């Protein structure tokens, strides 16, 4: 019987205080009756008063012996910490909240007489006297009165004197219990002292910054409960596992061999060079040693990323975590950033983002349109695509809620061959296609022609207030940088058809608002009804239209809390009305750019600080306009944030994957699998994953704490990731393809992109105090970030290697020695072979497989190793040209700030906040724009508000043709070097091995530049049809055959030796 209910108590319960019918009755009845009477004041139960029996006396001797043996065994187990039970008399110090449900302490004992009404265990838990019992319990157990059973009325049942033991035994047990408590206290004190020492040691190693201290203050909040406080588990919840996929011992041993062998190689080279008497050979050899040493440092710095190759494997899903913690799905804002992408690409990305598998009420999609002028047609197209996609999802959900199109489920005996199920699934898929077609058709018709059936409305005249509001809204100086008040929104919803048409033709940004009003009109439903009567529509009916009601809120501000990133905003919110159908909230945001717009960083910070508050969302996702997320993108990334109790995790990065690029058809190296594979995984294992600008989920608070996306660099993404690491935050990498994008396929756009990346690396390298970064992050993380910034400065080595074959073939200047065996053993193996062996071992290592993945992990192909070397030669000229732009931007910034480079770098990295803008919950009413601003905007002299000019392909080709020249020059130089080496091979027998090395060196350079030259000469907007990199193998074969022919044919073409 349930103890919470009234009724009989079972015999063997702790609430039944038993006594024997013999000599124990007189000593125990008083105490048991007193306790039973005191506790029974608040509760009631049936009395158990069995009649005394003389046979009960026979149990005493046997039961005393049995009970003493049982208690001794339990005492030993309990003192060793193996057994913790509350159903023994030994459990004096257990505190279970005053519960009477402590198990059986009277098993095998006779039933005493004279028992009063006893309380139920369920009602004794919540009594007011429980706290007093907890406080008085230890004292009463040590008091002499407890030994004789003269405890107070608030005493618990398990503190009663056991009638089966004597007074001396009770004293001995009390002494043992006291000793046990003292031992436990001593152990706890020792543990606390050890923890205090560990904290002091860790604080001495790394002192927390002021941002870390302030960050830990708002960690302990009511809404940030940990797993222990909710379900009472002591074991920490495991969300993911870090699994290494390559042996660290083998990897470190191979790197040690690489370093030691290179030291011997450079020592041998230096000794050989110092013994040269030829001035040309000596000078060239010194220069070659310097270039090789720089390459060695770059290789060692790059191999540092591979020291800890691990992959993160999720072991729980987001739903399981939220179910355990009893929490709801967090609110996520997904920002899609666009600048000059075509509206079709932006619309496709927005459609996939709004269709993600996530609760609609917790998902918010925002399109950040950073086009140059708000009057431009591109901005209107972006706004229309936002409305179209929002309405599409809303109508689709409404249709599915009205029509049940799920196929019937048949049992196996009814459909043993699966024919009925297969037919039902086909019917369901065809039905979904019809629904999507009908919804798409209606949206296109409704957006293009929203005035059908106007004659069905009853005409009425507009009043004076309506005309005044129309004139106010049509004022170009007042809209759309303004906020609608509640009264204005109500007036607009009640406008006449003539007023709505007047507003429709006044400004294109008011059309979404007018369409949301028109959709509620009766003639729209009548139009759909007519179509249904004519059998033109099957699923889209008036009931679905009634459920798919949405509202549009026009907001914009001329005065902004943070005016450095915007001088005015246009914001249009699409939200569903109160009803059963909920679609993700959508927002279109456009800013009026200030004189220094800060590009993408300013666009994101405007949305973060000026157009959102802390209560709006907890997590922030960033997507580029051409990156389409997987439906499970959020479900696969958000679990990482729940494994971080201290909220030190700032963001989780996912890889970039391009649908128009394949492993063998990637001549420009867009896949970059080496970086998105072991490099990112190795850094993530040390909590230092870089931010690549897109496909990442941020926690809003860390990004807000550092002042948003960083400025002073065109690669603001890498700068922001470094700033978060310096501020004490962690960043992880989830190697699963969850976002698919498109990459530039022509050489011109690729070179522009790589030049911008290299310029940003130069700016970050110049504005970073590396000593300060090393003190904050340590050597390893500092080298991670240095490797991301130093690669443009290694590009001159590629030019030197490219020009060396021609120099050596003309002047016959040796590299090391003329003996090929020594050159291969001492030079080729440490410099060229060992780094490739290390990379190949790591790149081709087998990754741990994770069940339930939504996308594949990036698998590194064999050609990716060659792509890394290919891009090193192919983009060398582009990287060198970025020095000038990066240095010029730094000099311009220093002149504008009137501060030294070191002071600017220290200020930029030490500050905890760029600026603290205060964002109001309610948007303020804007004022009229100043006449000076209007005149400046109309004149077109404002730099940030110039009209967008489409790119002129001819002018862009002429402007960027200088980026193609280094590749073409290197290609021609190496062709000449190979021809010279082939001809001299038959003339100078003493230099034959040197010429073989020269020919191989020049061939390697030509191989790396092979895919760039046709694209540079053709200037095509499409990808060069470069079928496979393995075509180079055929070229090697023909060259080897040519060498063999020259060896056996008696033809010698001698060229006089220069010098």
Curated annotation (Swiss-Prot):
The EC number(s) this enzyme carries: 2.4.1.12
GO CC annotation terms, alphabetical: apical cortex; cytosol; membrane; mitochondrion
Family per record: Belongs to the glycosyltransferase 2 family.
Pathway(s) per entry: Glycan metabolism; amoeba cellulose biosynthesis
Protein name from the UniProt record: Cellulose synthase catalytic subunit A [UDP-forming]
Catalytic residues (UniProt): 370, 717
Chain intervals for the UniProt region annotation (Disordered): 1-159, 174-220, 933-953
Residues noted as binding substrate in the record, renumbered to the chain: 624, 626
Keywords recorded for this protein, A-Z: Cellulose biosynthesis, Developmental protein, Glycosyltransferase, Membrane, Transferase, Transmembrane, Transmembrane helix
Record has Iron-sulfur as a keyword: no
Localisation per UniProt entry: Membrane
Segments of this protein annotated with the region Catalytic subdomain A: 328-628
Annotated spans, Catalytic subdomain B: 701-761
UniProt feature, compositional bias: Low complexity: 15-36, 181-194
Gene3D superfamilies: Spore Coat Polysaccharide Biosynthesis Protein SpsA, Chain A
Biased composition (Basic and acidic residues): 939-953
Membrane topology: Multi-pass membrane protein
Function: Catalytic subunit of cellulose synthase. It incorporates glucose from uridine 5'-diphosphate glucose (UDP-alpha-D-glucose) to cellulose (a (1->4)-beta-D-glucan), which is produced as an extracellular component for mechanical and chemical protection at the onset of the stalk formation, when the cells exhibit multicellular behavior during culmination.
Stretches that traverse the bilayer: 246-266, 280-300, 306-323, 790-810, 813-833, 963-983, 993-1013, 1035-1055
A Pfam family annotated for this UniProt entry: Glyco_trans_2_3
Biased composition (Polar residues): 40-57, 142-154
Source organism of this protein record: Dictyostelium discoideum (Social amoeba)
């Amino acid at each position: 019987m349930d103890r919470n209910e009234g009724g009989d108590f079972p015999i063997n319960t702790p609430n039944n205080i038993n006594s024997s019918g013999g000599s124990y009755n007189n000593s125990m009845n008083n105490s048991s009756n007193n306790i039973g009477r005191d506790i029974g004041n608040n509760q009631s139960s049936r009395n158990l008063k069995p009649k005394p029996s003389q046979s009960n006396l026979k149990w005493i001797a046997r039961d005393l012996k049995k009970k003493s043996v049982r208690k001794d065994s339990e005492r030993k187990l309990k003192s060793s910490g193996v057994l913790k039970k509350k159903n023994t008399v030994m459990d004096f110090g257990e505190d279970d909240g005053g519960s009477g449900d402590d198990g059986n302490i009277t098993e095998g004992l006779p039933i005493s007489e004279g028992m009063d009404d006893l309380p139920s265990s369920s009602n004794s838990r919540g009594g007011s006297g429980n706290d007093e019992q907890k406080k008085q319990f230890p004292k009463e157990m040590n008091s002499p009165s407890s030994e004789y059973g003269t405890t107070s009325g608030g005493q618990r049942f398990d503190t009663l004197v056991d009638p089966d033991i004597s007074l001396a035994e009770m004293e001995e047990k009390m002494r043992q219990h006291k000793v046990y408590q003292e031992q436990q206290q001593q152990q706890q004190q020792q543990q606390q002292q050890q923890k205090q020492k560990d904290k002091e040691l860790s604080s001495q190693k790394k002192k927390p910054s002021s941002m870390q201290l302030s960050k830990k203050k708002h960690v302990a909040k009511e809404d940030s409960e940990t797993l222990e406080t909710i379900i009472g588990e002591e074991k920490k919840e495991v969300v993911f596992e870090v699994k290494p996929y390559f042996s660290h011992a083998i990897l470190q041993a191979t790197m040690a061999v690489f370093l030691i062998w290179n030291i011997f190689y450079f020592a041998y080279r230096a000794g050989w060079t110092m013994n040269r008497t030829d001035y040309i050979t000596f000078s060239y050899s010194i220069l070659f040693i310097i270039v090789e040493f720089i390459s060695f440092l770059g290789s060692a710095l790059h191999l540092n990323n591979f020291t800890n190759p691990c992959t993160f494997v999720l072991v729980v899903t987001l739903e399981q975590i939220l179910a355990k913690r009893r929490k709801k799905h967090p609110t996520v804002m997904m920002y899609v950033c666009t600048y000059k992408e075509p509206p079709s690409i932006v619309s496709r990305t927005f459609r996939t983002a709004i269709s993600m598998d996530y609760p609609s009420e917790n998902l918010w999609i925002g399109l950040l349109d950073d086009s140059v002028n708000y009057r431009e047609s591109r901005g209107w197209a972006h706004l229309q695509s936002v409305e179209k996609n929002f309405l599409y999802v809303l109508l689709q959900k409404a249709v599915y809620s009205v029509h049940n199109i799920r196929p019937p489920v048949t049992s196996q005996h009814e459909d043993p061959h699966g024919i009925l199920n297969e037919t039902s699934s086909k019917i369901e898929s065809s039905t979904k296609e019809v629904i999507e077609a009908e919804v798409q058709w209606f949206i296109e018709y409704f957006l293009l022609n929203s005035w059908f059936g106007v004659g069905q409305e009853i005409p009425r005249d507009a009043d004076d207030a309506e005309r005044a509001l129309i004139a106010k809204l049509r004022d170009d100086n007042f809209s759309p940088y303004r906020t609608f008040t509640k009264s204005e929104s109500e007036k607009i919803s009640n406008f006449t058809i003539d007023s709505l048409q007047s507003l429709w033709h006044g400004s294109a940004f008011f059309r979404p608002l007018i369409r949301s009003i028109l959709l509620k009109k009766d003639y729209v439903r009548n139009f759909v009804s007519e179509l249904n009567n004519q059998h033109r529509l099957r699923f889209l009916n008036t009931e679905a239209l009634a459920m798919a009601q949405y509202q549009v809120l026009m907001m914009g501000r001329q005065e902004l809390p943070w005016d450095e990133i915007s001088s005015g905003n246009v914001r249009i919110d699409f939200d569903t009305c109160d009803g059963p159908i909920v679609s993700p909230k959508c927002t279109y945001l456009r800013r009026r750019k200030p004189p220094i717009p800060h590009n993408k960083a300013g666009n994101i910070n405007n949305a973060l600080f000026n157009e959102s508050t802390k209560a709006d969302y907890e997590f922030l996702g960033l997507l580029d306009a051409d990156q389409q997320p997987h439906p499970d993108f959020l479900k696969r990334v958000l679990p990482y944030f729940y494994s971080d109790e201290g909220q030190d995790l700032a963001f989780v990065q996912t890889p970039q994957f391009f649908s128009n690029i394949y492993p063998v058809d990637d001549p420009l190296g867009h896949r970059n699998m080496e970086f998105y594979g072991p490099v990112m995984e190795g850094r993530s294992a040390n909590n230092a994953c870089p931010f690549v600008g897109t496909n990442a989920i941020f926690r809003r608070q860390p990004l807000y704490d550092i002042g948003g996306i960083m400025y002073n660099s065109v690669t603001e993404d890498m700068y922001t990731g470094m700033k978060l690491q310096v501020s004490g935050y962690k960043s992880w990498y989830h190697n699963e393809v969850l976002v698919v994008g498109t990459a530039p396929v022509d050489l011109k756009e690729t070179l522009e992109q790589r030049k911008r990346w290299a310029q940003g690396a130069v700016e970050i390298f110049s504005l970073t105090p590396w000593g300060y970064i090393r003190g904050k992050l340590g050597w390893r993380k500092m080298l991670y970030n240095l490797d991301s910034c130093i690669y443009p400065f290694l590009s001159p080595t590629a030019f030197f290697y490219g020009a060396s074959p021609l120099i050596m073939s003309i002047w016959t200047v040796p590299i090391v020695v003329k003996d090929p065996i020594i050159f291969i053993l001492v030079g080729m193996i440490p410099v060229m072979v060992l780094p490739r062996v290390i990379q190949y071992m790591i790149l081709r290592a087998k990754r741990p497989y994770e069940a339930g993945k939504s996308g594949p992990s990036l698998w590194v192909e064999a050609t990716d190793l060659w792509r890394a070397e290919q891009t090193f030669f192919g983009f060398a000229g582009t990287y060198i040209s970025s020095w000038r732009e990066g240095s010029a931007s730094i000099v311009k910034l220093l002149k504008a700030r009137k501060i030294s480079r070191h002071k600017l770098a220290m200020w930029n990295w030490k500050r905890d906040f760029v600026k603290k803008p205060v964002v109001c919950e309610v948007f303020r009413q804007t004022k009229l724009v100043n006449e000076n601003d209007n005149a400046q905007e109309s004149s077109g002299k404002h730099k940030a508000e110039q009209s967008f000019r489409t790119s002129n392909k001819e002018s862009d080709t002429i402007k960027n043709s200088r980026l193609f020249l280094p590749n073409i020059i290197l290609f021609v130089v190496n062709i000449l070097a190979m021809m010279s080496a082939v001809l001299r091979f038959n003339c100078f027998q003493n230099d034959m091995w040197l010429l073989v090395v020269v020919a191989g060196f020049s061939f390697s350079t030509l191989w790396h530049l092979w895919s760039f030259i046709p694209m540079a000469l053709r200037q095509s907007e499409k990808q060069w049809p470069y079928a496979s990199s393995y075509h180079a193998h055929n070229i090697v074969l023909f060259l080897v055959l040519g060498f063999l022919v020259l060896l056996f044919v008696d033809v010698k073409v001698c060229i006089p030796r220069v010098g």
